[in-house]
Amino acid sequence: MKNIFALSALSLAFASSAFAGSSYVTGNVQFHDDGRIHGSDVTSTLEAGHTFDNQFGGFTVYTEFDGIQLGKLETENGGAGNTTPAITVGGEQSFNITDHLWVAAGYQHLFSAGENVQYRPLVKIGYNFDNGISLSNRTRAHIDATDADADTDYRMDNRIGYVMNEDVTLSYNNVYMIEAETMDHEFRATWTRKGVQPYFELRSQAHGAENSSGDSLVNNAFVFGASYGF
C-alpha cells in the first residue's frame, strides 16, 4: 500500500512541479441510471498530470483516481457493490510526425485496494485537420496482474473531435473491448474558455455486457466535469 501511495505522490509531484511544459487537473461527477457496473448510482473521477516538452513532442505523466463512489450502492442483480477506487499511474511519450500527424506510446499501472490489478501498455495515433476535425485511436492491452490470471483483453478508443469555434469543442468516442465484446458511446461538449474549462458528457455504457442471469447491464450516465491547465 505504501508503494502505491508513493508512486501516486511522485506522479502528482511531477504534475505540479515547474518543469518546462504544462500541467493539468481534471475531475467529474457521473450520474448513472443503472449503476450496477460501477457499484453506485453516483461516481467520480479525478486526474492530474504534467507534460514535459522534448524534441520529439512531449512526455506526459499522470495519476488518476477512478470509481470514487458517492451515491447509493448497487449490490443486486449483478451490482458491483462497495468497491475501492482504482488508481492509475501512467506515462506517455508523443511523437509529432508532421504538423498534423502524431503517434504516442505509453504504459499505465492499475492498482486497487492496495493490490496490483492490471498492466496496461498502450499505443495511440491521431491526425488533426485544418478544418477543426481530429481523428484518433488508442489501443490498450489489459493484462491481468491478479491471481485470477484472466485472459488479456484489449480496449480500443476511436475518437472524432470537432472544434466548432474558439469556445466550443465537440467529440464522440467509441470504446470497444475486443475479448469481452462490449461497447461504450461517449458524447462530449467542452467550453474551451481560458482558465477552467467545464464539459458535459453523455455516456451509454456496457452494451453487450450481461449479469449471471443474462440481463443487460447497459448504463446511461450524465457526466459533469471541468479541466484546468496551467
Residue ranges and their predicted role:
Residues 2-7, 16-230:
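Outer-membrane beta-barrel proteins
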